[in-house]
Regions:
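Peri-catalytic and regulatory segments of divalent metal-dependent proteins
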Residues: 22-145, 193-197, 203, 209-225, ...
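Metalloprotease/metallohydrolase-associated module, dominated by Zn2+-dependent proteases
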Residues: 36-40, 155-205
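Post-HEXXH active-site segment of zinc metalloproteases
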Residues: 137-163
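Sec/Tat signal peptide C-region and signal peptidase I cleavage site
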Residues: 16-21
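Bacterial N-terminal signal peptides
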Residues: 6-15
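Positively charged n-region of N-terminal signal peptides that target proteins for export
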Residues: 1-4
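A general structural-boundary detector
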Residues: 8, 29-30, 171
Length: 238
């Protein structure tokens, strides 16, 4: 009797295995987890490559206060679990570079230009949304960089090709204007404690950039006049 019972259970388990193997919900979450792991690994690889390429005379360091502030803003996003980290480059040129997985690189020039807490929150929050919406990963895939960088990840550290990694990083940096900056602006504002106040602060800051920077050096973060227009049109929830 026990033998038949055990046999029946084995048959039942075997019959369930194909169903579980193709379970779309399980497959979705497994794929999502794998993609997140790949995203974090790619971000770490790009960050290390960026740091290795940086000239010694320009200092770059992690900013604990800004990192904590970014993580606090990320609590209101769909990807609060990522380890958001802010690196600051000692450069007068305002710039910001979101990397996959949670790293944000900003210049001291950008932080100096952001004269209020609301403006700094805007910078951090919009980059939280870039990362939360996987804009950096979409850019990597759209530019055809994904297979190459995955291949480098699978290679042992000491055997990775620095020339290939350098090209990946440069191609990514060159195409940052293609990120959806308008969407990051509009959704990032909603992460802050006072979206309306942040919106006004953002408009003021971007207008100052459009006068000082945009006419002579189009900024990497998209079409400034168009971004300002979208922020001015934005209707916030009551």
């Amino acid at each position: 009797m026990h033998r038949y019972l055990i046999l029946s259970l084995l048959i039942s388990c075997l019959s369930l295995q194909p169903v579980m193997a193709v379970n779309p919900v399980m497959r979705y979450f497994t794929q999502l987890l794998d993609e997140t792991r790949a995203e974090i690994a790619i971000g770490e690889l790009m960050r290390e490559q960026f740091l290795s390429e940086f000239p010694d005379y320009l200092k770059i360091a992690s900013d604990t206060d800004m990192s904590l502030r970014m993580r606090k803003l990320a609590e209101n996003s769909s990807r609060a679990e990522l380890k958001y980290n802010v690196l600051v480059i000692n450069s007068d040129i305002p710039d910001e570079i979101p990397l996959p997985g949670g790293t944000l690189i900003v210049t001291s020039g950008l932080l100096t230009a952001a004269t209020t807490d609301d403006q700094r929150d805007f910078i951090l929050a919009r980059n939280v949304m870039h990362i939360a919406l996987k804009h950096p990963m979409k850019l990597i895939k759209n530019e055809g960089l994904y297979p190459t960088i995955l291949n480098q990840l699978k290679t042992r550290t000491e055997q990775r090709n620095p020339l290939i990694l350098r090209k990946i990083l440069r191609d990514y940096l060159r195409n940052i204007p293609k990120l959806d900056h308008k969407k990051a602006d509009l959704q990032g504002i909603l992460l802050t404690s006072s979206p309306d106040r942040t919106r006004k602060a953002a408009i003021e800051m971007l207008k100052s950039f459009s006068i000082r920077i945009w006419p002579v050096l189009p900024w990497d973060t998209g079409d400034l006049p168009a971004r300002i227009t979208e922020l001015e049109k934005l209707k916030l929830p009551e």
